[in-house]
Amino acid sequence: MGVVSQGPVYYDLFEEFADLATQGMCPLGAPDERGHKDGWGLACFQDGALKFHMRDAGSAADASKYYGTAWKIAKLNIERAPGRSLIVMGHLRRASSKGLVAQRFAHPFVEERNGVTWAFQHNGSLVSTPVDGDKIDSQILFQMLLNHLEGREHEAVAKATLTARALAIKEFGGFTGLNFMLSDGRSLHVYRDFQTNGQYYTLYLDNLGEMIVAASEPILAMKAEPIPRGLLHTVSSDLVLQRTAVS
């Protein structure tokens, strides 16, 4: 989930999102017992600065820390002051391997580069992930993006995405899904791509008035039409949308 809002981000949204931990679509085409209960995380930028970052192993639907953090975020910008903005990212994890269920592997991941704080979350996996107990494939993808970013603007992220995609194919044999959201606090970048199971690796994007919401499955009153594969969408803090074909 990713939200760019000029007002508050309602608590109802966090509740509905948490329900996807048990009710969300799974790779076989329907919810299953495993669900997306191997980790959760929330990151919130207020006016470009990282305000909250909380994550843990386990299911968001059962986590008091998840709801507590969501409540704190929901109280921000209630006054709708002009020029203020919120960018919120949320992730529910379904681990590719049960041995990799741990807090440190919960998304979104946050890293500072050249004075800029980036948050990143991903759905999918690399075909041949290196045996490295310190990083999962999503973290490797994050590093590839950051290593090839030449700026913060839409065009720079599109270029880095193209390079990271090519490296994923060349060095790791490709990917199942390359769906990700990336933010520097000023914009939210949303990308959908897959080489298998496109009915599972979906991403939806909708303008709900004072906020634009992106999610793997429609929540609240989002339209049920996924964004096209291979098209990077960038939402600025003033809700301007840019698109660029990457693949």
PLM region descriptions:
Residues A57-N77, H91-N114:
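Short acidic (Asp/Glu) patches
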Residues L42, M89, L141, F180, ...:
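A residue-level signal for conserved active-site and pocket-lining positions in enzyme catalytic cores
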Residues W118-S128:
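Conserved beta-strand-loop-short alpha-helix elements that form
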Residues M25-P31, I87, H154-F194:
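Catalytic core of PPM/PP2C metal-dependent serine/threonine phosphatase domains
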Residues V3, V88-H91:
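A short, Trp-centered hydrophobic/proline-enriched beta-strand micro-motif
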Residues D132-K170:
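Glycine- and acidic-residue-rich phosphate-binding/metal-coordinating active-site segment common to enzymes
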Residues M1-Y66, V190, Q195-G198, G230-S247:
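Extreme N-terminus nucleophile/cap motif
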